[in-house]
């Protein structure tokens, strides 16, 4: 019969050791809660950390960029600028379109921001042009966020106008109603319309003007209330034939009489069914199409939104004619799922490797089963907490769990190893479990809370980076806490039931061989440690050297922000000369498409020409290149981009700018390349002076590539210089001149055709086929006060000038954005420093301000806070350790292990050619928590030996190092193997995971080798310092 130890032994573990059924059921409950939580958790690429962003679009066909800025954008900006919680406001005013992007503070709910935007639009309504065809429309979407899904709609039998009409009414509206969808954009949208193309010569010959025609059309097509008749016995609603629905009806419209004979619209104009805007076009591969881009709302889950769309698509396509084909060209969730699947596989690999290393050290199947149960239980239990915290299964939380594999097994290893040591000494399993668990309990608590202390500063990181890593830090902390609970409850209980002297002594050939190997390693370590303790100052100099080396490596290592991911989608901008027309740009775009589609890595291509919410001018085109899956192509995205740019360089007259889409989008506007730098001034004249000078210098920097600017001030303008005196004598106002020009050349929307399903426009313009270019202005006629017809040329001169193709604002002031990429042999930190140095050489005036934007600005912010973040982690851990050990000295001994980890991590990153980015920095912070475990295990046992066995400090630390050598080696290798799958990852999203693994593996290897020798030396030096300090105080007291 087994004699139980006294009830004072076992500590907090005693209750669970003595009640195995209750402990087992408790663990089953944790397991079930975790499984249920896993099934309930949403899946995403990264934590949802989007800024609340709203885009406001206003269309005013025919308006110049200058008119759009002053008449539409500026009044709206003044109202938006008064909203609380607004972080940044940017706008782009181009020909016929104003796009304002409003980015709010992270703390402001999107719904609240939406209400403020609507109120601001309402307040600005009276300030906007009275002939604005439609009021401003807002969407809860970030325009820089790539579409979650792109669909192409084509037809072999129907014109694009009919296809667009069906897609808009039957498909796009339904998709827009799906939860999480922020905006559905129809690129190349050929909306049906009745186009009236006036024959200038015909109306002039009849003494008519375009304004006469416009007035006749608007008066003939109305749709207003008419009332009803309410008699004694019945009510009658009034109706009339006041609507004209077809081109034929408009063709027969009488617009005037001459000599008693009617003049019909068809006599002076070509009237046809056409497109509302003839300067829009989109293509899927080489076929003209309606391209439907679906963007999510900020904060919406991509996976669930895309799944809802795919579930609805079959039902929607069934309502379309058979000649209409809907093709899904890209779906970002495909790569997101693949990335998450790869990370989950790496998590399983980490668990398998950790269990393998445990068996290698323990050489005992029962002893291996215990942590083999504890590790998955700790990780699975974390899912239950993640549900309550509203987290998701994403790359960062899965990376946290993968790293946690090496952490959580440490607690189990420490407990098992200590209990096994007592069983091998002859203790009964139950007594050994109670004694071993009680002895190691404080160490487990110290390890747990000191490691969590390292993660605390991550929770206080500001802005979007802090939000991004909050889920990572909390997930890891929860896994560590659950591991500590499991290690103090389930693990000792299983040890008491599964371990025995017979099982621990049972050895096979492998066990005996490995035991001899470990004995030789420990003996060699003991001899080496004895020599090191005899030369403390030499060892201390090595420790100080690692500190100095870590600082030097930190200064010189290339620095970045976020790893560039290969998500299989490339966004592109095609740029042509500023005077390019729509037809010219469409032709150039098709030439480029032919080149791109020949690349073996390209699966499909969508392209768009025209002015809309993301494309500012007719001389640019927008591209989306969808690559084949990663396992079906030989090269990663950066090599594909380089190859495509080289191929397109052979196409004359165009510049192509490409960038891979990323899961993390911080920018608020679609840019040509990955990084942005802005110049802001109080006037456009100041920008026109300084932008070319800065561009010239930046294009010469080797640290930058693909440098471009959105400053386009060479757009051709035909300036109509009216002689106001002559016009006034004839009774012609400037409003008459503007109306005549707008009627002729503005694709003016003059009337609306109402149907049961949609509304369509009547478009008025001059037929300029026979009078191209500036000659068309000679055909303009105006009506004088006496009813005569006056040629525009008689009161005005035409001057050719240059003007901006688009006018951009940032927080209401003119701005230009310079975009750039970083070559492979340089880092983002190099590029940022080069730009800052170049800016200083220009001596910019005080009214010019510069600032990095988007991810570059976030990089600067993260880089500035990194050192403080690490310092905060060290201070937090010092405070926790000081509280736990009730000592000012021992925490310093433990923290002395940190420089070795930093040296190892930085060296590994440099050897691997990886930048010190945000992911790598998180790895270094985690190393701070890992490597101090070695010192904690040594110091705990040394202090116990001094206190309980009366050993000298040197004997105590020497014995502690030898006794704890095996668990130290086991825990370090477990942590290393937990990070190894991340370091070796090659699948989708590997770019995101690899820096974390590289830094941790490098840091663990170097720290493992050095801290086994430096920690005991520093422990003894601080012990001598403490004795010297005490003796000095004692001497002063005696003298007093």
UniProtKB/Swiss-Prot annotation:
Keywords: Cell inner membrane, Cell membrane, Membrane, Transmembrane, Transmembrane helix, Transport. It comes from the Bacteria. It is found in: Cell inner membrane. Its main location: membrane. It is a multi-pass membrane protein. GO terms for cellular component: plasma membrane. It holds the Pfam family ACR_tran. The chain crosses the membrane at residues 16-36, 347-367, 369-389, 396-416, 440-460, 472-492, 537-557, 863-883, 888-908, 911-931, 968-988, 998-1018. InterPro entries: AcrB_DN_DC_subdom, Acrflvin-R, Multidrug-R_MdtB. Signal peptide: none annotated. GO terms for molecular function: xenobiotic transmembrane transporter activity. Induction: The mdtABC operon is transcriptionally activated by BaeR. The MdtABC tripartite complex confers resistance against novobiocin and deoxycholate. Belongs to the resistance-nodulation-cell division (RND) (TC 2.A.6) family. MdtB subfamily. Part of a tripartite efflux system composed of MdtA, MdtB and MdtC. MdtB forms a heteromultimer with MdtC. PANTHER family: MULTIDRUG RESISTANCE PROTEIN MDTB, PTHR32063. This is Multidrug resistance protein MdtB. It comes from Escherichia coli O1:K1 / APEC.
């Amino acid at each position: 019969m087994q004699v139980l130890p006294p009830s004072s032994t076992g500590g907090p573990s005693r209750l669970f050791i003595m009640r195995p059924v209750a402990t087992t059921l408790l663990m089953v409950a944790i397991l079930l809660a975790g499984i249920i939580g896993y099934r309930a958790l949403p899946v995403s690429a990264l934590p949802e950390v989007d800024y609340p962003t709203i885009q406001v679009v206003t269309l005013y066909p025919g308006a110049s960029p200058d008119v759009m800025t002053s008449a539409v954008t500026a009044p709206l900006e003044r109202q938006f600028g008064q909203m609380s919680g607004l972080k940044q406001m940017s706008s782009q005013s181009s020909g016929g379109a104003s796009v304002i992007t409003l980015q709010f503070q992270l703390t402001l709910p999107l719904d609240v921001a939406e209400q403020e935007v609507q109120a601001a639009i309402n307040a600005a309504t009276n300030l906007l042009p009275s002939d604005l065809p439609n009021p401003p429309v807002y969407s809860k979407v970030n325009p820089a966020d790539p579409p979650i899904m792109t669909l192409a709609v084509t037809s072999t039998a129907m014109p694009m106008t009919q296809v667009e009409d069906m897609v808009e009414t039957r498909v796009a509206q339904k998709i827009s109603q799906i939860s999480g969808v922020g905006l559905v954009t129809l690129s190349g949208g050929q909306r049906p319309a009745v186009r009236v193309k006036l024959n200038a010569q015909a109306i002039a010959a009849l003494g008519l003007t375009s304004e006469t025609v416009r007035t006749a059309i608007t008066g003939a097509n109305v749709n207003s209330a008419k009332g009803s008749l309410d008699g004694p016995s019945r009510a009658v609603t009034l109706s009339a034939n006041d609507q004209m629905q077809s081109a034929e009806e408009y063709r027969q419209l009488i617009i005037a009489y001459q000599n008693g004979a009617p003049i019909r619209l068809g006599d002076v104009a070509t009237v046809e069914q056409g497109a509302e805007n003839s300067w829009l076009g989109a293509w899927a591969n080489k076929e003209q199409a309606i391209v439907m881009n679906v963007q999510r709302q900020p904060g919406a889950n991509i996976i669930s939104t895309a799944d809802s769309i795919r579930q609805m698509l079959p039902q929607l396509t069934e309502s379309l004619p058979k000649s209409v084909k809907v093709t899904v060209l890209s779906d970002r969730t495909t790569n997101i799922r693949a990335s998450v699947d790869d990370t989950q596989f790496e998590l399983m690999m980490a668990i398998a490797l950790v269990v393998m290393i445990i068996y290698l050290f323990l050489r005992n199947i029962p002893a291996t089963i215990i942590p083999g149960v504890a590790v998955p239980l700790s990780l699975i239990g974390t899912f239950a907490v993640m549900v309550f915290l509203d987290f998701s299964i994403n790359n960062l939380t899965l990376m946290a769990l993968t790293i946690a594999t090496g952490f959580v097994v440490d607690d189990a290893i420490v407990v098992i190893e200590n209990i096994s040591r007592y069983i091998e000494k002859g203790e009964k399993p139950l007594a050994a479990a109670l004694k071993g668990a009680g002895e190691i309990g404080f160490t487990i608590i110290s390890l747990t809370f000191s490691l969590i202390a390292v993660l605390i500063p991550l929770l206080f990181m500001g802005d979007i980076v802090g939000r991004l890593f909050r889920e990572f830090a909390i997930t890891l902390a929860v896994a560590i806490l659950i591991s500590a609970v499991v290690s103090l409850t389930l693990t000792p209980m299983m040890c008491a039931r599964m371990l025995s002297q017979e099982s621990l002594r049972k050895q096979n050939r492998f066990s005996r061989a490995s035991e001899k190997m470990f004995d030789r390693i420990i003996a060699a370590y003991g001899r080496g440690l004895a020599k090191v303790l005899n030369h403390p100052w030499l060892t201390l100099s090595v420790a100080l050297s690692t500190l100095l080396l870590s600082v030097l490596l930190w200064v010189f290592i290339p620095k970045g922000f976020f790893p560039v991911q290969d998500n299989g989608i490339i966004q592109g901008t095609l740029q042509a000369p500023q005077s390019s027309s729509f037809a010219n740009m469409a032709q150039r775009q098709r030439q480029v498409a032919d080149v791109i589609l020949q690349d073996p890595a390209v699966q499909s291509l969508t392209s768009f020409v025209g002015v809309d919410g993301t494309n500012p001018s007719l001389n640019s085109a927008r591209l989306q290149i969808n690559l084949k899956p990663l396992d079906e192509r030989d090269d990663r995205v950066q090599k594909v981009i380089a190859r495509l740019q080289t191929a397109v360089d052979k196409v004359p007259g165009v510049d192509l700018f490409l960038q891979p889409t990323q899961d993390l989008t911080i920018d608020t506007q679609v840019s040509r390349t990955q990084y942005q730098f802005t110049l802001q001034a109080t006037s456009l004249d100041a920008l026109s002076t300084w932008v070319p000078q800065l561009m010239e210098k930046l294009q010469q920097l080797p640290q930058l590539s693909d440098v471009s600017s959105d400053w386009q001030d060479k757009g051709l303008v035909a300036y109509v210089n009216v002689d106001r005196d002559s016009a006034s004598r004839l009774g012609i106002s400037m409003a008459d001149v503007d109306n005549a020009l707008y009627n002729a050349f503005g694709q003016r929307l003059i009337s609306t055709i109402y149907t049961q399903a949609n509304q369509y426009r009547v478009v008025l313009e001059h037929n300029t086929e026979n009078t191209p270019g500036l000659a068309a202005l000679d055909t303009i006629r105006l009506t004088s006060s006496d009813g005569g017809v006056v040629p525009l040329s008689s009161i005005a001169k035409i001057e050719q000038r240059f003007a901006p193709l688009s006018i951009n604002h940032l927080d209401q002031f003119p701005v230009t954005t310079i975009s750039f990429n970083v070559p492979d042999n340089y880092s983002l930190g190099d590029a940022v420093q080069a730009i800052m140095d170049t800016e200083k050489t220009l001596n910019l005036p005080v009214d010019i301000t510069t600032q990095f934007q988007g991810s570059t600005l976030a990089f600067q912010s993260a880089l500035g806070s990194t050192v403080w973040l690490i310092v905060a982690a060290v201070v937090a851990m010092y405070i926790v350790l000081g509280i736990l050990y009730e000592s000012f000295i021992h925490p310093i001994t433990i923290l002395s292990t940190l420089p070795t980890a930093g040296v190892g991590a930085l060296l590994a990153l440099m050897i691997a050619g990886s930048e010190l980015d945000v992911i790598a920095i998180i790895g270094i912070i985690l190393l701070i928590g890992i490597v101090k475990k070695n010192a904690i295990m040594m110091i705990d046992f040394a202090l116990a030996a001094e206190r309980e066995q009366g050993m000298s400090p040197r004997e105590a630390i020497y014995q502690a190092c030898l006794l704890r050598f095996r668990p130290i080696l086991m825990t370090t290798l477990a942590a290393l193997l937990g990070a190894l799958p991340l370091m070796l990852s090659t699948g989708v999203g590997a770019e995101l995971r690899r820096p974390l693994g590289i830094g941790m593996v490098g840091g663990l290897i170097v720290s493992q080798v050095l801290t086994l020798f430096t920690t005991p030396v520093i422990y003894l030096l601080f012990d001598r310092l403490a004795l010297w300090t005490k003796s000095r105080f004692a001497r002063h007291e005696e003298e007093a």
